[in-house]
Amino acid sequence: MGFTRAILGSSGGIDSAVTLAIACEALGKEHVRAVLMPSQYSTGHSVSDAEQLSKNLGNPYDIIPIKNIYDSFLNELKPVFGDLPFSLAEENIQSRSRGNLLMAIANKFGYILLNTSNKSELATGYGTLYGDMAGGLGVLGDCYKMQVYALARYINREKEIIPQNILV
């Protein structure tokens, strides 16, 4: 592919944690950028866990809150959505906003965007097209969820790199 640097969204979840750790090992920590994009629905520990993971790995990371972007989308869609109840459409706006931000940064700085979906999610259709499924390389695309947890335990075999909260 020709890329020597990568970027990914770091959610504080197991898939992004394992993807980040593998990318840092493969490319070198200085060549992998993580972006934390909390929303009003993010838990405090997911942000702190993602931040701690990047500190443990030593890779650069950014925090870009998406609440204003999400609210702007909802505001613009209000005339179309009207009074219809909240649904998957609104939920997916968060994921697609994150995907757009990551692609913009990847394009600006010449990174490849790493997809963090695993094979279990892909097989069951659990993911958002143009959102968390965005990316030029799916590091975990051939790994079932159980294998992702096994990889996390392997990564942590000598010391805690992936915070314990992510593993439970």
Report residues per predicted region.
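A glycine-rich phosphate-binding loop feature that marks nucleotide/adenosyl-phosphate handling sites
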Residues: 4-16, 69-70, 118-120, 165-168
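A conserved beta-strand->alpha-helix junction
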Residues: 31-32, 36, 44-89, 95, ...
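Residue-level detector of anion-binding/catalytic polar loops
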Residues: 4, 60, 112
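ATP-dependent adenylation/pyrophosphate-handling site
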Residues: 4-10, 14-51
